[in-house]
Amino acid sequence: MPYRKLTQCEIDALVASGCEAEDWQRVEVADVGFDPTRLRHVRFSGQISLGSAVDLRDATICDCMVGDGVRIDGVRSALAGYEIGRGARLTDIGTMTYRAGTTAGNGVRVAAVNENGGRAVPLFDGLTAQTAHLMVFHRHRTETLRRTFDRIDAYAATIAAAPRGYVGEGATVEGCGRIVDVRIGDRATVCGATLLQNGTILSQPEAPT
């Protein structure tokens, strides 16, 4: 999507609506379809990209890419480090942040069967029952396990290399307290969570979570 800098008239309209920015030059907007009158009491910091027809109110937004038709209403602390997909809805949230270098739960080892940790399984968002069974009950297949673990670690590294977290297209996040280092899939609904940290919520349009 092509972006452009704000015009002075748009900046004046935003300021009149109670919006502010550390540096307006770091706020980019969709070349077509951006309407400053749809933003109220929003504070921007860092690098910001805003799509067309966004509806933003009562929020502090830092280093985010906000897609077309996104609605954000009521972020009490901060929304930081996310790419927010087209048509997503984020309302009544305490804080929602994503730090560069996190793996969103991918590669984290958890004890399975043996709680002393002798059969730790690395989690990742493509984990199947068959792969988990292999890692827990076939420890003698050392070369197969090594290759499996290496693939999972390599995948986790690709997640860590991403500059931002992700909220999927058409996702809804509402009434949540604190969300930290969590990736959220397309069409997912997250409602009333007190704390979510270091994880991935898998979802897709044909099978929403």
What are these regions (language model features)?
Residues 1-165, 169-170, 176, 187:
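Terminal amphipathic alpha-helical/low-complexity segments used for targeting or macromolecular assembly
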Residues 165-209:
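Core mixed alpha/beta domains of very large multi-subunit molecular machines
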